[in-house]
Amino acid sequence: MKPYMARKLPFEKEIDYNRIAKKLIAASSSVSKLDGMLEEENISRELFINPLTKKEAVLSSQIEGTQATLTEILELEADEGKTDSKNKYDDFIEITNYNKAIEYAENEVLDKGKISLWLLRNIHKLLLNGARGKDKNPGEFRNEQNWIGKPGSTIENASFVPVPQENLTEYLENLENYINDFEEQSELIQAAIIHVQFEKIHPFKDGNGRIGRMLIPLFLYYKGILSRPILYISEYFEENRDEYYDKLNAVSESTEGWLEWIEFFLNAVETQANRNIEKFKKLQNLYGEYKGIISEILNTKNSIYVVDALFKIPVFKSTKLHEEISKSIDIDIGTVNRYIRKLVEAGVIVPEEGKDRYIKYYFKKLVDLIQ
């Protein structure tokens, strides 16, 4: 199979906005509502955003073949990454790296005011640090031809062969210019095009899918459409994985293929923006509910710090909960253990079964909500 020579951006022919108008309006409206919620002062990153960012990391990684669930990642965090399963440990590292990479990217875009090739390389370096792809030149664009196919496939029977390495620089520079120096009529349409173009270029030896999906909220954040790079779209892509790949693969010189991809993308954006709005509302309601419940159970002015800690680490060991609460107040481990016993007796948290020491505890209401 010959390498795919992607079209340079922007397109010479305009996109048929009449055809996609309804979907675009609906998706834009949902994103606007989501951003309005993100701008509220009571939407705390640590309490409400980080749990869903972890879920996005899990789902984006699952599209690439990881198996770990969000609950398993939370358990591994409580165990500080200790596990007898190499696969689980590798999944844990990949997902942890994803979280670090998106937070780093947000700060860099805010600081530098652009999405540069330098930034993409640094995101890639963070993503692959100590992970399965650590031998795939983390932080470096590929210097040889790659291809996509089933395990063991060759370039001759590959399902897709990206841009040749000798053309990589010109395509990446074209993409960088399109991201930073060009404005489509709609930023959502531009995000859809950027995602496809990045995947068609496939500039890294590994990690292209995750970075390509990360680029979607990052671009909307850069353009000011989102006040934070929060548009957890991987859930929709994972649920519709076959269609996601079919639509990506169908994009070529054909205008129809592009339009079908854009329609699919706008459906994903609208669906996930609405889901995220509902999820944030449920998280806020749960937080308000348990502020009252835990205050009544513990009967102490420290209860608010306990609630905050449970939202930050919904699966924990007593020492970790003590460490988290101690970031806000001076408190001894004995007092924290007393709080834990009361919360277990009240059914607010559930202890790990079958262990007498170093027990993990689960704030099940929150775990179930974000899972």
Predicted regions and their residues:
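FIC/Doc superfamily catalytic core
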Residues: 1-371
